[in-house]
Amino acid sequence: MEVKEEKLMEEKQRLPEKTIPVFTVLKNGAILKNIFVVNSRDFSSPERNGSTVSDDDGEVEEILVVGRHPDCDILLTHPSISRFHLEIRSISSRQKLFVTDLSSVHGTWVRDLRIEPHGCVEVEEGDTIRIGGSTRIYRLHWIPLSRAYDLDNPFVSPLDASTVLEQEEENRMLEAENLEVAQHQSLENTTSGDEGVLHLDVTSEGTGSSVPSEDEDTYVTTREMSMPVASPSVLTLVRDSVETQKLQFNEDLQTSPKWDLDVIESVAEKLSGSFVRSTQQSGGDVEGLGCSELFDAAEADECDVRGDGGLHLNVISEKMESSVPNMIEAENLEVAQHQSLANTALGDDEDLHLDVTSEGTGSSVPSEDEDTYITTMEISVPLASPNVLTLARDSIKTQKLQSTQDFQTPTMWDLDVVEAAAEKPSSSCVLGKKLSGGYVEELGCFELFVAAEADKCDVRGDGSLHLNEISERMESSMSNKEDDPFLAAKETSSLPLSTDFINPETLWLVEDVQASPEFCTSSVKANAENPSSGCSPSTEQIDGCFETSGCSAFDLAAEVESLSLHQEVSEETEFVTKEVMGVSSEPLGKADIRSHEENGESEDSRQVIEVSAEPVAKADIQSHEENGETEGSRQVIEVSPKSFSEAEPTIEILTGEAQGIIGSEFPSELAVETESENLLHQKSIGETKNEIRSHEDYGETEDYGETECSWPDIAVSPSSVSPPEPTLEILTDEARGLLGSEFLSEVTVETEIENLLHQKSNVETKADILIHEDYGETEVSRQIITVSPNSFSKAEPTLETEDSRQQARGLVGSDSEFQSEVAMKTECENLLNQKRNGETKVSSRQASPVSDCLSTPKDRLSSINTDDIQSLCSSSQPPSESEVNPATDQDQESGIISETEKPKTELLIGSGRSEKYYSLSEIEGEENTDIGRLSRCPIPSALAAKTSEDTKLIEELSSSDSGSQENQTPETHAVRDDVLCDMDSSSTCNIWSRRGKAASVLKIRTNKSQGKQKQTGRQPKDKLHRKQALSDKSISLTIHHGAEILEPEIFTPDKENLTPSSHMLKRLQDIGDVKDSKSSLKLSGKSCSSLVHSSIAVLASEAFTEPEIFTPDKENLTPSSHMLKRLREFGDIKDTKGSSSKATRKPFFDIRMEENVMVEQEPEDLHSLGSKSKLKHEPLAPKKKAERAPFQPLLEKSSFQSQSYTEASSTASARNNISRGIRSSSNLSDAKSKMKWTIVLDTSSLLDKESRKPLQLLQGLKGTHLVVPRTVLRELNEVKRSRSFLFRRRTEIASSALDWIEECKVNSKWWIQVQSPTEETKAIAPTPPVTPQSNGSSAFPFSLHWNNYAPEIDSPTSEDQVLECALLYRNRNRDEKLVLLSNDVTLKIKAMAEGVICETPHEFYESLVNPFSERFMWTESTARGRTWSHLDNDVLRERYNDRACRRKSTYNRGESGAAAKGLKLILLHNSHYGHTH
């Protein structure tokens, strides 16, 4: 090697060697490869070019293109690199290299500076280049040409080599540090970072023992220790506070698979505080570990380490030397009692993990928990938020855990956990010790769990404290000063709760696995109490004995197997009694939460129990109230979405438990089952059944008899039932608690229904009416009853009897005091928040006091339908204008009845359900979406009776209209509208008054009339025309004295969010203007009749309200703008033509309607004719054009109704007008119909693979229709059957084309059509001349001429047959565009001669999707997401219009482009053929 190098040096000295540029590719500091920029001549003969540099090519400039395109010189495949990204120009003789960015999208960086598009930058040696979004770095070097061919010694630049060496040195240093850490077991830097996770990983290793770790993040091997170290910013161990921490391991391999761990930890004391240690010796000594400022959790962030965010103390026991004599070596013989002490630290996610692992010679304990490390036992205790549970420097005392395990029995072990409480200098905390053979009774903490602002822990499904204890022995070199009986006898003093320190109270961590080998916690008890009351710890033994030592708060023993219950305490500073339910992490089948209220009183206590856990099959929450009174308690039980498994979409209706509370005397059956079915169908998958059974010890609900109304709002939180988080807010428990705890009338339980109902957007809840009559008093609990449309049986409508209605009216009329309170207490916002999907919410708050109707046990609620609610709501309405002005109202009623001469006509307005279920209350609920507003004022029963009579009159008005639908007369509509206006005037306190609109705008419509509006559909438009004309001509008959001239208002029934069409409103206003400009009314002879007068009078009464649109019952029904254009154009055309005798004919009205009403202008008839001819033509549209599906009526009855109108109006003049309307509509819709394309295929377009891609993109596109001629199928079949080896590829393409046609026939049958044999036409040869020799000498040439061309005529080519097919379909469908797709130039020329558009499939597809093309099919569409709207139009035009030209200029090279000029002209002309510019 040295000889070669010397020779190379000599050659360099003699002659200058040619250098070439090389790019070294670096990624993450590692060299990936080198890119040598070598000329082709240099590559062919490196020796010659390497030895000498010729003068002629000294200034040769090499140009390289870099990009993603295959034609680039340097091909890079990163997706952020443009196809032609940058250009590199190099002059090797001068060692100059320049880079030019070719307007790349993501740019090019040289020396970390982005260069401008088309900007040229010189790159020097050592500079770096970054291309696009790629992380690779290209560093430029100049090397000798011969160096590039030295494959044995790859080129590495010194700069890159130093970088690689530095990286390797860093790796070696890190490995050395890790090895040192593993050898010395340095725990001084054990910190707990922002995630609040402290890992003390000490692996217990013995002969042949291996701990299988189930955690992903820890790597526990035989001689290696993995120590995750968090950020020390928050959780730091002060240097002065930690002197030494030593672990001493003593293992006895001779006895059994048991081991002892002695951990001796010495603790330093801070100047400001003293550390007190309490020890407990029960066969073993455990010393506490005290550290100052161990966890300052106030600043700690949420932890997401290891997926469960807990505080992990994984103590991996190692043999370590100890500076302290091992005092408990003799006690190693007692292998049944191993005690572990770990830092009881509080993480931010409220989890503490003490992992207990037992191992010995060949013993391995499998983990029961899928998340924990190797846990044989897991204790889960709910913790609170770190901002409350913070340990101050001086408030931290010793916390000791003493764990005793006995592995002699396989399924049983005992845990002794003793934790010494933290004390402030001014207070002390008792640690009750009870040493009974290794049993620990209690762990004293005062206010340990305060869940103020407790964050939800998305860790393992529950936010609880996990104590995964690794049983170890820990000792301290300090003396056992605290092993004093005085400490156990200390009294607990109640301290004010602060966010700076924790006052430990009693916490029971009791484990008993004798009954179950699944290591589930039997019970966890946490008692907390108000600061004002002292709490002495109560003890609980593992044997199951409960000893109560006088705790005045609730003692809640929670036995949970799969629910994690953590507390949520509101941010108020009130200290309320909380009952914390402990959990076990094992997801078992059923959870029983029993709440025992034992002796004691709790004043104004509030119990908040939130269930948030892993998949739960069934939760039985049983509430027992035992001797004692709870005054003013509020109970909200919330079930979090995580507590539901996504397997059973079931929701238990809360009324069932209410039935259990009230007893068999009050069966609540008002559509409870049907409503539960509806809810079950509406629920998304992911909610489990919650059965809540309430058991009351006394069997009855006793009320004190006051007439105060408590209002337990029973509702379901709605966002909780949304599909992503199926949550059910179980609020009936509060009703249960209220009814069962003897203070129903005392407490007004406002269970924050606003907070819950603002979430409820699209779920309806069902609550029953809870009415108790105890001691003769009526206790009324207010509720919201949601009546779903599906809850009513359409087949068997239950009609409420008149007697029950009178009873209801009498009850409400008599109890005016209660009624006023009910009316004033009504909250309409609840219904407004709940009403999102258009279900009718019936105000049962007025119906709830119907105690007389509710007294029967069997038919209490099943017989109550909305008629009762109607009567109640009617009685609670404010005084209408008829009450204020009775004389006028009576005149109105008598006038209406006498003029119309049909008092039995029913008011037919509604949503199509059974009309017997409809009442005034429900109608107002539909119209106003604000039920309670109408019932704010108490009304005497007399007005209720009168309103019921009015309602009865309205109900009786439907007898004639319920029959044939086409026998409608204008008087019927007039009566309906007049009664509607009467109702409008009576509803003053409605939703419109809140919005600043006059109350008379609102139309109250009952069932049949609304259905009729949906039936006739279009008839109200003509009525509005006549009304507008009458109002403009000032035909005023004083019916509404108090009516005002209102601004145009739109009536949108039954849908709160329905936005009316502004186009239709403009059209109606334009019609009114047109009518103003016309001549005066022409009255016919029959117009003087009383019928016409009455109809004019009633129409004039509504004429003061300007045009309104009635859109029937569908919130997504959008009026057709195309129809409106046709209507406007009809008006313009007929206005210019003037009056016509034919204009008085009305094809869509019955003959009798013409006889009754003849008061119209000629333009009115023309306008109505326009609207009706359109509707007459509309049912025929689906038969002819499939694209008109959006214009079809969306209601079920409308097709039948339009057919009935078609039959009823089948007169000659109607047919003439309709035919003219169809012709004019076809002319008007020409702009729309030109967007329909009939596509005829050629064989060449299917055999070309590139041409078939656009066809596949066109598949199923509305507005296009594909026709496949039969000759194309024949040709494809012939190609497929050809077995030629040379054309095997063509055979495969033909086979795939036939498969695609078959797939289209199956999947998109409406889109593709194969030409039928009857449609296929054959070319017929012309008849030859009779006498070929008749022309004398010219006969022979003629004969030869004929014979030469006769064979071609007899057998036409496939192109001719395809063209004939195209001409056939063009003549058949004149209103559609036809295009012939072919790549054959001959066929294109023939098609051009016939005037048929012929293009390639690619050109046709691009013309459809080009937004600047005349053929663009989505001109009226709305852009969604990122579309072309964010680019400049010029850029788009350049992109779309110049695409073909750029492609041709790119691929045509020189001579070939010149040779095809003529063909280009033909193709260019053809591509724009038929386009109208």
Swiss-Prot record:
Low complexity bias: start-end ranges: 870-883, 1213-1225
Keywords from the named record: Meiosis
Region described as Disordered: 188-218, 588-644, 789-818, 832-911, 942-979, 1004-1030, 1159-1225
Keyword Lipoprotein carried by entry: no
Protein origin, superkingdom: Eukaryota
Gene Ontology terms: biological process: meiotic cell cycle; pollen development
Outcome of gene disruption: Diploid pollen grains (dyads of spores instead of tetrads) due to defective meiosis II. Abnormal spindle orientation at meiosis II.
Biased composition range(s): Basic and acidic residues: 589-607
Gene3D superfamilies per the UniProt record, alphabetical: 2.60.200.20, 5'-nuclease
Bias-annotated ranges (Polar residues): 832-849, 885-897, 957-971, 1007-1018, 1198-1212
Misc note: Diploid male spores in sp1 mutants give rise to viable diploid pollen grains and spontaneous triploid plants in the next generation.
Function of the protein: Required for normal spindle orientation at male meiosis II and normal formation of tetrad of microspores. Not involved in female meiosis.
Protein name as catalogued: FHA domain-containing protein PS1
Biological classification of the source: Eukaryota, Viridiplantae, Streptophyta, Embryophyta, Tracheophyta
Originating gene: PS1
